[in-house]
A protein has these predicted regions:
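Structured alpha/beta or helical-core interaction and ligand-binding surfaces enriched in interleaved
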Residues: 1-177
Length: 177
């Protein structure tokens, strides 16, 4: 069973383990995404002005498989007002997200989860936004990921997701492990 987030559909992934400043994340996101990619913000308790902006800018999901993945719908009982907003990753949207990131005192006022995808593939997933690991698809050129890493001041590593995460789960399930 995959973790409760959008799968990147590749075993090899880039992982950023350290905290990332929200402003730096949105400022340098164009190094990873194109304006035609879709950025998804999963929000449980977004500030009202932020929620209004996200709702006004939201577009229908552009990647059919997104509807069939376990995303944030599973949390509806605990977070009945939770919503995933699909947005164009264009400069206007990112400028506004930078402005919001500068104005919040806690990241949950902005969003709880972030994902991004092209029309064909998932590109990144950030389940615990700004404090849990950010996973980036190896479909994004390594040179772009290196530039993003340099710009935000957070190192990354290439990992085999299944070996890194599922071998740990299996070993915990085995007796005397």
């Amino acid at each position: 069973m995959r973790p409760m987030w959008l799968s990147l559909d590749t075993n090899l992934q880039y992982r950023f383990d350290d905290d990332i400043a929200p402003v730096a994340f949105f400022e340098h996101l164009p190094l990873l995404l194109t304006p035609t990619d879709t950025l998804v913000l999963g929000c449980y308790d977004a500030r009202p002005d932020i929620r209004r902006f996200l709702a006004a800018e939201a577009v229908p999901p552009a990647w059919g498989r997104f509807n069939f993945t376990e995303t944030w719908d599973i949390n509806r009982e605990e977070h009945p007002f939770g919503t995933a907003f699909h947005l164009r990753a264009d400069s206007g949207t990112l400028r506004q997200l930078i402005h919001f990131a500068e104005s919040v005192t806690e990241h949950i006022e902005l969003c709880d989860h972030i994902a991004a995808y092209s029309t064909e593939h998932p590109l990144l997933v950030y389940h615990g936004t700004f404090w849990e690991p950010l996973f980036v698809s190896t479909r994004i050129p390594r040179s772009n990921v290196e530039a993003f890493s340099c710009a935000i001041g957070v190192p990354f590593e290439e990992i085999d997701f299944d070996k890194t995460y599922f071998s740990a789960i299996i070993s915990h399930d085995e007796p005397n492990a």
